[in-house]
Amino acid sequence: MRFFFTTLLIVSLSVNCVFAQQKTPVNFGKITTADFAIPSNTVTDSSTAAVIIADLGSTTFKGNDKGWVGYIFNRKTRIKILNKKAFELATVKIHLYTEDDNREKLENVAATAYNLENGTVVATKMEKRDLFADRIDKNRVEQKFTLPAVKENTIIEYSYTVYSDFYFNIPEWTFQNIDYPCLWSEYEVNIPSLVGYIFSKRGVHPFYIDKADDGHENYLIKRVTDGGRGAADNDMMSISATTVKHRWVMKDVPAFYVENYLFSPENYIDKIDFQLAQTYNGETVHPVKNTWTKATEDMLKDKDFAAFMTEQDGNRWLDKPLAAIVKSTDPLQQAKEIFYYLTNNFTCISYHNKYIKTTLQDVVKNRKGGVGEINLLLTDMLLRKQITAAPVVLSTREYGYNYASYPLLDRLDYVICKATIGNREYYLDASRPRLGFGHLPPNCYNGHARVIDMQDSASVYFLADSLKELQTILVNIVNDADGKSGLRGSYTNSPGYMDSYLLRASLDEAGQKKYFDNLQAAAGDELQITEAGIDSLKDPENPVKVNVGFNIKTAATDIIYFSPILWGDMKTNPFSATVRKYPVEMPFPIHQVYTLTMETPAGFVVDEMPKQARVSFNDGEGYFEYLIQKTEELIQLRVTVSMKKAYFPPEDYNSLREFFGYIVKKESEQIVFKKKH
């Protein structure tokens, strides 16, 4: 059974009536003292910081002066803020789309905060001057406002209208909030037969109301000449069309609980979105589905993306700095010289950005830019040196999945570079200084990505399962030279490349001292670290190696209890919840091998020792192995934890939880040494 469902239907051509009509249980604009009491529900508790009482959206279509239809989107929201942790809800952000001279318009913005003071409801309205606009990129503007007089137990209401001619991109609707429960979430869309949409519904909660009604509307549309100009004001045409009005409601929707090992709530949260599939002029149905071929053509013409790839002169100004950067004549070494010049000298200021916001010359001058700007600059530099290269667009794990079947550019937040040198392809990211040539950060391994190139455009896939991480830990413990001072030992941890990258990044923030202090704290008082270091820390193309020397005190006692896994044991089960609705998404498959060779402490013998064990998970998808043996003088232990894949559906959760629970218990077992008599 799958963990969520995606429904695909053309929504303007069918009717599905499931529930009878039920009115929205909120009277907007009229707040009484009774409204300050939260209605009875099943999704709030003492930890709830705010409750979305009602969130209503509607989209209707209208004729426009561009020869077709646009839409009107209305939203009304009421929220009860319970404590200061939810004050962020008082700031509302609205994204508007713009393309050339055509832009969406925001109107009828109203926002009011209601407080109960001495038994009286006091309303404080937002002033229009408190509405601000920020440009996100060339196609998106963010309008933002903050409601005044917000404090604990305030009720806020806001509403607004968006007018848009971009009928190909009608608003999606999210029924579930990541942080706050919602008592009533409703979306209504009235779609004429002039346009048809594919909609996809995701999430695990069912609709409380799922209703569709046939109707009929007239649309007054201004004629447009072949040149694209509107005709005379009185040259209008009235088009009659059948409609389908859809109403979707979810009731008592819990906040989305973000569990361990889940890439992005966006992939699983309750929502519905739309893609234009066709238009109908009364005689002929015209498929309008966008394609990656068309999207690639547009992006290669876009001066804010990859137009430099098709311009004859390109960015010739790059030849001068390249002459100073590139010294080798070998193409691979040239590519590395360019790559490391960027990683070592440029600062990435945004890791969710695919467009050039200013110019590549500004990026070079200021030595900083977004991930898109830096990797587009890398692509351009490689092309200037006659190295085959192209940008690759993708969606990072935290941004959610994107579709291989059709392009939704808003879901793409990241750009890397594909370079082909000899018979080998390299995927590069020059925005991260601790990342080596030919490697990508873990969050890029999120499935589908698209190469943007006129000659070699294609879908590529970066899957978590393709990352093969091997970690080995070697521990050697011997008696001190005099046989009386205790034990001394060495610990060598050789993580895989991704773990090495993550360690390098954490050391940049906290430093090596903090790292080794944490190792010392985890080891306890009986073990003292005497020396420590990290090999290959400055070599981003290879994994690191952590080396530690230590002494262990053997107290004047008849019994020693020894935990044979010094570091790296699993202290707690990462899957503590008894029930899980969503899949488990590990960053990559794991294969960890811990090996201990230990002399029996002088004057002691082994009294008790853990038993050997081997446990398999899901018919070979993973296994845990605990092998231990002893002689009179020596103990040898080998512990292996292996997971061959990174993704597990919800139906595997219980067995996964039991598997890791067993590992935690087994790795906590001790060896007992008894003094010789």
Q: Which residues are covered by each model-predicted region?
A:
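Bacterial Sec-dependent N-terminal signal peptides
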Residues: 1-26
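A carboxyl-terminal module marker
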Residues: 516-677
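Secondary-structure boundary elements
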Residues: 291-366
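Sec/Tat-exported extracytoplasmic proteins
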Residues: 164, 342-346, 663-667
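Beta-strand-rich, non-transmembrane domain signature
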Residues: 21-290, 294, 373-379, 383, ...
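Secondary-structure capping and boundary motifs in well-ordered enzyme cores
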Residues: 148, 330-334, 363-374, 409
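Extended, non-catalytic structural segments that build the interaction scaffolds
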Residues: 322-328, 473-474, 581-586, 606
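Short coil/turn segments at secondary-structure boundaries
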Residues: 89-93, 171-172, 201-203, 308-320, ...
